[in-house]
Amino acid sequence: MKPEIIIMLTHHDVTVKDAGEIFEQCKDLAVKFWGFKNVGLPKDEMKKVAGAMKAAGKTTFLEVVTYDEASCLDGAQTAIDCGFDYLMGTVYYDSVAKLLKENGMAYLPFVGKVSGSPSILEGTNEEIIQNAKDLMAKGIKGFDILAYRHVVDGEKLAREFCAAIDAEICIAGSINSYARIDTMFDI
């Protein structure tokens, strides 16, 4: 599978205030995947920006960094209300997966033990890979792995995870340099 980049209109885990303007200036780039977080913009503005992305033929992603079930459900409902194609993030809950499936939305939950703000990823590579396999058995078809937030070796984790898991994989977590972007294409 050819790697793709998702342009996230965020800074320090918050959607930038001028996300709509930035997208309008960049919408003709040959980048298919665009998104932002559920924090930083009011919901009506999120809906407007997501709509502009879709009108330009882009696939849209909302990333939600929450850990309790109620907050994860709220983030899922926001993604649905705003018309996103994918919800990325949230700790996996059956209720979130069910809501998204009922509304025809793709779901890339976090994998491994994610906590804190900014988020960190804990667990051995083997535990994280097994967590993904367990979620795939429940019907999950892709993951948001915060490799560069891993407490040990994010690059090694990303390589091992991609080799072991046959699913859509979004490697995330501070991919904020050309060197890290190049590494993603190498993996």
Residue ranges and their predicted role:
Residues M1-E4, A56, E102-M105, I165-A167, ...:
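Short coil/turn connectors at secondary-structure junctions
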Residues M1-F61, T66-A70, A76-C82, M136-A137:
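Conserved N-terminal beta1-alpha1 strand-loop-helix module at the mouth
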Residues P3-T10, K32-F36, T60-V64, L87-G89, ...:
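Hydrophobic faces of well-ordered beta-strands that scaffold small-molecule active sites
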Residues A19, M46, C72, I128, ...:
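Aromatic/hydrophobic pocket-lining residues that form the small-molecule binding cavity
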Residues F23, A50, A76, A97, ...:
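Generic hydrophobic/aromatic pocket-lining and core-packing "Φ" positions
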Residues G57, V65, E69-H150, A164:
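Conserved anion-binding
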Residues A147-R159, A163, D182-D186:
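Contiguous, function-dense segments enriched for cysteine-driven chemistry
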Residues D166-I187:
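C-terminal alpha-helical cap/extension of soluble enzyme domains
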